[in-house]
A protein has these predicted regions:
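A short, solvent-exposed, low-complexity linear motif enriched for acidic/polar residues
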Residues: 23-281
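Bacterial N-terminal signal peptides that target proteins for export
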Residues: 1-11
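Short, linear, compositionally biased motifs with a strong N-terminal bias
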Residues: 13-16
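C-terminal motif of bacterial Sec signal peptides marking the signal peptidase cleavage site
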Residues: 18-21
Length: 282
């Protein structure tokens, strides 16, 4: 059987990488190991006004090569051990679940979620993150500095991401990238937040990078809505939006939830450093 090693999966968005451990060969020499390594990480783009966004994961599932392959928290060695961040309504720890605070892994930071998993070579139609119960966001609802834990739910308890191809002998590294400003909503009339798949994408680490820079104070001063020197340096002073393509007219560029033609690919906040610089990383 041709196989690939699914080496490492990380979340914070989520990154995964696939490495070729051995050269691929079409002969029947069983001494040639046709495997690939898959790594997955998780990472996030920050969300406004939240102190924590803890998402509870139960498993990673790969589909497209016969029966789905599932790696379950607390059962399989390729995924991290369960922790005590996910609790039910009685305060009891939910078994076989790991809670990850996405706000701890923003920008280029990530946490490992799947490591050294051996999978059959071939095309995989989807990577699914199977969610557990107990996800929540800690937010300041009244602006008084006190946070409240608000439930976060995921439709169908699964985040279905794009697929990938595992070549025999390959080593893949991917990230499941969460953009909570796009994917987490608080519908009117409903309790809690909803985390939608549109705010999560599977990214090949070998083909992406991160941008960082600063915004001029003059530009911010020209925008009357920007508070350029907040007392709390964790308060964003502005936001940066990244779009796919070039040459667009400014009037065609939408912000998060806007109706204009060109929707942002990603976004991030700009922060004042307390001295003279306004910095961002995306």
């Amino acid at each position: 059987m041709k196989a690939a090693t699914f080496g490492q999966v990380t979340v914070a968005a989520l990154t995964a990488s696939l490495l070729a451990a051995c050269g691929g060969s079409d002969n029947n020499d069983d001494s040639v190991s046709q495997t690939a390594t898959f790594n997955l990480g998780i990472s996030d783009a920050p969300i406004d006004a939240a102190e924590a966004v803890v998402v509870c994961f139960n498993a990673v599932e790969l589909t497209g090569q016969g029966q789905p392959i599932q790696y379950e928290v607390g059962v399989d060695v390729e995924v991290p051990a369960e922790n005590d961040l996910c609790r039910d309504s009685n305060g009891d720890v939910i078994a076989n679940t790991i809670g990850i605070d996405l706000l701890q892994f923003t920008g280029s930071e990530q946490t490992q979620f799947l490591q050294d998993a051996t999978i059959a070579a071939g095309n995989y139609g989807q990577l699914r993150l199977v969610m557990g119960e107990g996800s929540y966001a800690s937010v300041d609802l009244d602006g008084d500095g006190t946070t409240t834990d608000v439930p976060v739910s995921v439709p169908s308890n699964e985040l279905k991401l794009d697929g990938f191809t595992a070549d025999a002998g390959g080593n893949l590294n991917y990230t499941a990238e969460f953009d909570l400003r796009q994917g987490m909503t608080n519908p009117v009339g409903q309790e809690g937040f909803i985390l939608k798949p549109r705010g999560v994408r599977l990214v090949d680490n070998s083909s992406v990078g991160h941008l960082q820079g600063s915004v001029s104070e003059e530009l911010l001063l020209n925008e009357t809505s920007c508070e350029v020197a907040p007392a709390d340096l964790t308060t964003p002073v502005a936001y940066i939006y990244l779009y796919e393509g070039i040459g667009y007219d400014l009037s065609a560029l939408a912000d998060i939830g806007g109706s204009e033609q060109q929707q942002p690919y990603a976004s991030t906040a700009v922060y004042f450093d307390g001295a003279a610089s306004y910095d961002f990383q995306i």
